[in-house]
Amino acid sequence: IGNVTQDIYNFSPQQSYAYIDQSKDAEGFWTEYINTKLSYNFNNFIIELGKFNRHWGNGVRSLYFSNKAPSYPQIGFKYKLNQKLSYLYLHGFLNSNIPDSSRSSYYKNDFSLRSISIPRNIAAHRIEWKLNDKFIFSFNESVIYATRSLDIYYLIPILPFYPIENYIGDTDNIQMGFDILFRINELQKAYVSFFMDEFTPEWIFKSKNHNWFGWQFGYNIKDAILKNSEFQIEYNWTDQRIYMHKYDINDFYNHQHPLGFWAGPHAQELLYNYITYFGDRILKFHFSKTKRGLNTREMVEDNYRDMQLKRYEQGYEERTLVSISFKTPSNIKDLRYSI
């Protein structure tokens, strides 16, 4: 049918599939994978369109946009105002995987059936500010909206989404965040990323505030231990209440996978990378330890009633990965292989 629920790569940073179908003529399953991107550069103005993933932030992982969810059609631009300021905007078309019964009825008969999903979209913009050679600040805002194919209000790039969302009825899902990069010196840098879901200004300093967060902290140093090497440590933490909205049509998901941090809400990950370069050969050591708690639709509804449980109270799953890889060029031009 197409919209097939599947758990492959559910607890892995590996990009998930949009769908998996059973083969009609043989045993097993099949899927489709396609990425395409067209960019046109007008000096300080870049237009992008296609079907691809983005990565916002300075870390290995991203709380905002990562390549975990299947790629999605989108159009956007980046405008470099001057040497210190840049502005980014995008509009993407997501898959909610929630059947639209009013339209699906037109795609069924005695021998065939197709499932049509209710439209879900995302609009996002980002300001990048290079304060000096030490600090770079980025400020993000996005909105998930659904049930209409396109909303003209969110196509106006310069408008802030938060007041617009309230203006048209408070039916959508707003996210905000920032990234900070601090270059300690030529060899070291540190970074912080912050993601906020469900912004309610008047409740900021209350214990029950409906302002729910995700955090990322990282540190990177070059030439550590060995010359031409790089060491990175990173910690990611997500509240059990982010990404999933009180109306599931507005979840921060595409094809049932989070657009941001790969493990989704109610999770944390500590990772280390150590990379050494030997000419055009690369040796990489990777360690990752992830913990993720239960997160159901019933729990989401309880969160909005301020009845949330303690973190990991109803159980959790853990994942530890240690890997060593070695990449080297082959005798065939532009071909590489790794073990």
Region spans (language model):
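Outer-membrane beta-barrel channel domains
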Residues: I1-I136, V143, T147, K208-H210, ...
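Exposed, low-structure sequence patches enriched in small/polar residues
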Residues: T31, K130-I339
